Swiss-Prot record:
This is Photosystem I reaction center subunit IX. The gene is psaJ. May help in the organization of the PsaE and PsaF subunits. One of its GO terms (cellular component) is photosystem I. GO terms for biological process: photosynthesis. InterPro entries: PSI_PsaJ, PSI_PsaJ_sf. The keyword Thylakoid applies. Keywords: Chloroplast, Membrane, Photosynthesis, Photosystem I, Plastid, Thylakoid, Transmembrane, Transmembrane helix. The chain crosses the membrane at residues 7-27. It is found in: Plastid, Chloroplast thylakoid membrane. It comes from the Eukaryota. The lineage of its organism: Eukaryota, Viridiplantae, Streptophyta, Embryophyta, Tracheophyta. Coiled coil: none annotated. It is a single-pass membrane protein.
Amino acid sequence: MQDVKTYLSTAPVLATLWFGFLAGLLIEINRFFPDALVSPLF
């Protein structure tokens, strides 16, 4: 179990999860607000 916890806390795994989440968020924002130069959410 310790090995799995160590693996899941490494930088490549965390970076992959973060960039995947960020890409999904940007895709959804562009789906609801297409061609927006400034996000209307802020």
